[in-house]
């Protein structure tokens, strides 16, 4: 996938992260004398590679394995758990699934994947949606999920970022 993006900022460019991701807390607001003109970015970083395996085991069950990655990560201070939980190239999903168990990294259990909007261009999620991929151990049955996930908290502007010593229980 190849992207060509032209941006014109009326209130200043704001945070460099905005050129790759939609993060509302980093958008420049208010009057600014910064007339930087337009910016053009072209890349193929949203191209994805996915490998899915389905291995039969005794009893008619199977073990499913998924490995998916892309290159959609910004270099520098932003290639961290807040954005991708990985580094260049960016690992999106890497998990094994057997019966009701899932072990690895995929969409957080706290996220409603069905609420994601259809979009040709990945700009992130709409405001108010929990969005993230976490390392986890998850058990699912009859519409109920129980998971132990990577503990990562980011609350912008109040200094409440934290890495806990115990996993998130969802």
Show where each model-derived region lies.
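Acidic/histidine-rich helix-loop elements
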Residues: 22-23
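Surface-exposed beta-loop-beta
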Residues: 157-170
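Outer membrane beta-barrel
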Residues: 1-17, 29-155
């Amino acid at each position: 996938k190849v992207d060509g993006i032209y941006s014109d900022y009326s209130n200043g460019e704001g945070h460099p992260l905005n050129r790759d991701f939609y993060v509302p807390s980093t958008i420049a607001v208010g009057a600014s004398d910064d007339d930087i003109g337009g910016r053009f970015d072209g890349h193929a970083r949203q191209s994805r590679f996915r490998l899915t395996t389905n291995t039969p085991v005794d009893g008619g069950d199977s073990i499913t394995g998924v490995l998916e990655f892309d290159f959609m990560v910004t270099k520098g201070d932003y290639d961290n758990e807040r954005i991708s939980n990985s580094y260049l190239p960016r690992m999106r999903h890497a998990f094994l699934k057997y019966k009701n168990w899932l072990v690895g990294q995929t969409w957080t259990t706290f996220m409603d994947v069905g609420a994601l909007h259809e979009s040709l261009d990945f700009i992130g999620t709409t405001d108010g949606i929990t969005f993230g991929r976490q390392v986890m151990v998850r058990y699912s049955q009859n519409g109920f999920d129980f998971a132990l996930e990577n503990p990562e908290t980011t609350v912008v502007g109040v200094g409440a970022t934290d890495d806990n010593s115990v996993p998130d229980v969802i």
